[in-house]
């Protein structure tokens, strides 16, 4: 197969080639994962970047995303307005203490008001004064140019806005905004020199072609960071009874994304615990980044299990990306 060697020599794989490889049952998933690992090791060694999410505003949303427990169609959900600055700042301290490189501040809704952007901006300034090396990622929805400039000025390093699925499959997932709304948001951030983060949710009924199209769309978008979420079905949502993933399929997807985006940060995100299950460690053979702790409205596994997983693989936390470098040689003692 020698895919990694070909890619390192400059070959650009086509969609047709990647789809054929992905669907070829004669190509063992672990062999494909090994090709991805060659690329991951070449560009990132054995380092793992750690990320943490804070749900700063929950359940107040007019959108009808079929995967989301915060959508307008869900009656029973956790709802609260944008939390006080102090709580967000406290979350940054927790991130620092847990060797987190990127702290992600997330808000529900179509997009933030100007008042909410000012609130986030003021908070980020305070966090940066206390933890200057902690990277801040904002995920606030659709924004305008003035809001993007405020976030940049405040010190926001990265902005997340996932494409979630392929352009072709988009309207099966959500109809209250367009695929272009999402890609335009990422382009706006790039225009304001904010690092673009955009990823996907797999397991919503998309085809193999859709999976390939997603990976190539993110390559064309030149997203710096690509979170791969695996659907964690939530009762009451459109995809609440979906069961389309196996651990091996998840690994195959992650390997495919690494082959197409060899130099990018690829993050294993929501749903990894319930979908990868005992094979979670193998995902880090292709991915070089994970979320630790809880997600927006679903729980994650205890941080210590993630530290142990990294250690057991012979990998290490990417201390170059985090401010807290204590316990550098023994993450098992981390809190």
From Swiss-Prot:
Species lineage: Bacteria, Bacillati, Bacillota, Bacilli, Bacillales
Free-text remark on how the cofactor is bound: Binds 1 [4Fe-4S] cluster. The cluster is coordinated with 3 cysteines and an exchangeable S-adenosyl-L-methionine.
Native source organism of the sequence: Staphylococcus aureus (strain JH9)
Keywords: 2Fe-2S, 4Fe-4S, Biotin biosynthesis, Iron, Iron-sulfur, Metal-binding, S-adenosyl-L-methionine, Transferase
GO biological process assignments: biotin biosynthetic process
Record-annotated Radical SAM core domain positions: 43-269
Catalytic reaction equation(s): (4R,5S)-dethiobiotin + (sulfur carrier)-SH + 2 reduced [2Fe-2S]-[ferredoxin] + 2 S-adenosyl-L-methionine = (sulfur carrier)-H + biotin + 2 5'-deoxyadenosine + 2 L-methionine + 2 oxidized [2Fe-2S]-[ferredoxin]
Cofactor: [4Fe-4S] cluster; [2Fe-2S] cluster
Stored Pfam families: BATS, Radical_SAM
Domain of life: Bacteria
Keyword NAD listed: no
Protein name: Biotin synthase
EC number: 2.8.1.6
Protein role: Catalyzes the conversion of dethiobiotin (DTB) to biotin by the insertion of a sulfur atom into dethiobiotin via a radical-based mechanism.
Quaternary structure and interacting proteins, as annotated: Homodimer.
Pathway participation: Cofactor biosynthesis; biotin biosynthesis; biotin from 7,8-diaminononanoate: step 2/2
Gene Ontology molecular function terms on file: 2 iron, 2 sulfur cluster binding; 4 iron, 4 sulfur cluster binding; biotin synthase activity; iron ion binding
Ligand binding ([2Fe-2S] cluster): 104, 137, 197, 267
Binding site for [4Fe-4S] cluster: 61, 65, 68
Gene3D superfamilies registered for this protein in UniProt: Aldolase class I (3.20.20.70)
Protein family: Belongs to the radical SAM superfamily. Biotin synthase family.
